[in-house]
Amino acid sequence: MARKTPIKRYRNIGICAHVDAGKTTTTERILYYTGRSHKMGETHDGASTTDWMEQEQERGITITSAAVTTFWQGMDKQYPEHRINIIDTPGHVDFTIEVERSLRVLDGAVVVFCGSSGVEPQSETVWRQANKYEVPRMVFVNKMDRAGANFMRVVEQIRNRLGATTVPIQLPIGAEDDFEGIVDLLRMKAIYWNEADQGMTYELRDIPESMKAEAEKAREQMIEAAAEANEEYMDKYLEGEELTYEEIKKGLRDRTIANEIVLATCGSAFKNKGVQAVLDAVIEFLPAPDEVKAIRGEVDDEGTEETRPVDDDAPFAALAFKIATDPFVGTLTFFRVYSGKLESGNAVFNSVKGKKERVGRMVQMHANDREEIKEVLAGDIAAAIGLKNVTTGDTLCDENNKIVLERMEFPEPVISVAVEPKSKADQEKMGVALGKLAQEDPSFRVRTDEESGQTIISGMGELHLDIIVDRMRREFKVEANIGKPQVAYRECIRKPVDVEGKFVRQSGGRGQYGHVKVKLEPLPLDDEDGENFIFVNEIVGGVVPKEYIPAVQQGIEEQMQNGCLAGYPLLGIKATLYDGSYHDVDSNEMAFKIAGSMAMKKGALEANPALLEPIMKVEVVTPEDYMGDVVGDLNRRRGLVQGMDEGPAGKVIRAEVPLSEMFGYATDLRSATQGRASYAMEFSRYMEAPSNIAEAIIKKG
């Protein structure tokens, strides 16, 4: 089957923002204008097409990023048909894992900001993630009809707080209630959308007199930015020649794709203004799959890297970036094809798990209706139905051309609660439900507490766990009681020690013999991408046979799960196996595993252990009148205030506070500031807990 849409006309984009910048409404409008959904959904009345889980509609926030395929030919049908795959990403900090996962498979992003509140803490997180994956992006300043909306202020904030070179390609005409349309700086015309047909049509007029000077100045800056794309344009510009319309577009496009500049547009999705122009800008300025850096992957165990071209005839390689459970068809695995093609009924090889699976049916999602497809090609995003062993971040590839596209790193959960089923009948269903949810979301973990026999679930924040329990009730009909949230403490060692672990059992017949000498050293904890555990083998001359060494490592790692102070897992340990002995007959893997865990247990006690607690980065936005109270309260919670800034909504206080002190903070902050302050927090790192706190926890533990 030949390609319907040439690869040059593909755009895989994400729409990202923080909570409430109006991201889902923006996506909704895009679906409306591109003709995929005939009735517009409003997030206010819970009917939006990308928010298809019940809880999302109730809470008005987006949790799972739905991938939607749309087609667009431009506001004036001036382009051949382009295929735009849109991934709507969640903006709530508890779901940053979803955002990270989506950015990974995108070629470009539209970052939505609120015209009045501007850059918020969450926007910084998203921006940082986009930088990490080098995603070219443009900005849409939304809600220009809101009180206090100011386009240029937001553009400045993006420059200062996110360190991006923002280049406006539009200006708003009027603001707040008087927001009428936009000035297109490329065409130097004013665009007014027609309210009678919800913005499907528009008219071009001359720029209002009062704005001509401002528009000229902004256009000059835009042309200068375009001229810096290459020497030819620069020379032309410096000699005072005019750059043509096409040259300006090409200059801006090249620099956007190189991640040198970020183009800024504005509008109000809710009022049907501006989104249409954003779609045109996506086609004009964001890259097609073959214009971004080719994806790299490891092709063997030595870590040899290769790239894969965006080509239908290359070997097949795709990345599974999301698993969702659908009430009608079961498991959906969303994947992005980087190279090659795949027909339904063919087998793919999962190179991370080393397993082969047959792809039965494939669908493309259009918000909430599905279209069955027979074949996917390079650049496509689709979902496969019923793959058994695939988890998020796995690579699907051609069995004869194995490749592992970069593995994703998932954050450690910081908060845990105990859950128990309300009735015996729910017990088994709960196990199945939690297993499925953990498969969908790697930042969510499930374990059974050995002492109490309780099921403990851990995640990235209170909202995250609320939603998990909620989904259990709705999708799997499991009623459960939740305990109080518990902080996920950890333990560490503070000094290096040499320890010996010896396990000998002679009881007639075959005995057991394992003997190891291990050096344990603490690793620095404040490393962003630091390792939690490093195992070094320094055995020479076979004093411990090679086949038993993995067993020693396993014994040490398993023992690290149970600390010696209060039973919390140990972090940040380097273990060096340097000596030991074995017995020809009695030694086996089990004996060495036990010897390893004995050494770890003994060593942890001798190595001056300490308790670690999770520290959160907290940002509070508050009116100036309550600033003293807020800072005082943060100090009472053992917080360290890192700095203060002016924000459009008041003072912004940045602090680091232990998670254990942050429970119920939302309620306390509301009552202290009469509901006028807001806060956001995310995990920063683990730090040693003060001795009085540690003692109390150890007594309890």
From Swiss-Prot:
Domain tr-type G: 8-290
Residues binding GTP: 17-24, 88-92, 142-145
A Pfam short name: EFG_IV
Signal sequence extent: none
DNA-binding keyword on record: no
GO molecular function: GTP binding; GTPase activity; guanosine tetraphosphate binding; translation elongation factor activity
Family: Belongs to the TRAFAC class translation factor GTPase superfamily. Classic translation factor GTPase family. EF-G/EF-2 subfamily.
Protein task: Catalyzes the GTP-dependent ribosomal translocation step during translation elongation. During this step, the ribosome changes from the pre-translocational (PRE) to the post-translocational (POST) state as the newly formed A-site-bound peptidyl-tRNA and P-site-bound deacylated tRNA move to the P and E sites, respectively. Catalyzes the coordinated movement of the two tRNA molecules, the mRNA and conformational changes in the ribosome.
UniProt protein name: Elongation factor G
Organism of this sequence: Marinobacter nauticus (strain ATCC 700491 / DSM 11845 / VT8)
